[in-house]
């Protein structure tokens, strides 16, 4: 009996290998041989994603793992799983709006430089007769492509053009 059991185990180990079936929202998305390695990869490549204007990344649905014996010929597909998870991830981007008299003039990605430019413009026009309510606000979006981010130099030029228009309009009314 022990010989028979040993033979069955040998056949199973010869034909099958232990592999994790990975599913997301109840849908099978692939196979991995090491669930811990995939979790580390998810953490480093998705959750801790680093890039321009990225504030944070969330995964609403974490993958589930189920250990199964599958045929040895089956190949794992960690890269495809990572692509599916990246598609499911929500990336929140941070950007800054330069506002003049309650009107958003432009968007930038560096708050320190934007605030410095705003202070320079305020200083240059402190003796003018018009009221300049200039500010920089922090904003967030999931789609950075919908925002036209400018360099701070371009933003400063756009604000100065608007200020010049306001000064001209103010002088015409006098």
Residue positions per predicted region:
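Membrane-proximal envelope biogenesis segments
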Residues: 1-174
């Amino acid at each position: 009996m022990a010989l028979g059991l040993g033979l069955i185990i040998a056949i199973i180990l010869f034909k099958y290998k232990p592999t994790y079936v990975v599913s997301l929202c109840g849908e099978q998305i692939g196979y991995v041989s090491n669930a811990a390695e995939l979790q580390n990869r998810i953490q480093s490549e998705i959750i801790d994603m680093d890039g321009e204007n990225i504030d944070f990344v969330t995964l609403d649905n974490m993958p589930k793992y189920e250990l199964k014996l599958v045929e040895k010929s089956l190949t794992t597909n960690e890269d495809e799983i990572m692509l599916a998870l990246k598609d499911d991830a929500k990336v929140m981007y941070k950007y800054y709006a330069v506002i003049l008299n309650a009107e958003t003039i432009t968007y930038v990605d560096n708050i320190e430089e934007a605030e410095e430019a705003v202070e320079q413009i305020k200083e240059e026009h402190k003796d003018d007769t018009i009221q300049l309510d200039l500010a920089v606000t922090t904003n967030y979006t999931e789609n950075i492509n919908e925002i036209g981010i400018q360099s701070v130099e371009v933003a400063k030029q756009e604000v100065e053009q608007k200020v010049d228009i306001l000064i001209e309009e103010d002088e015409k009314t006098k």
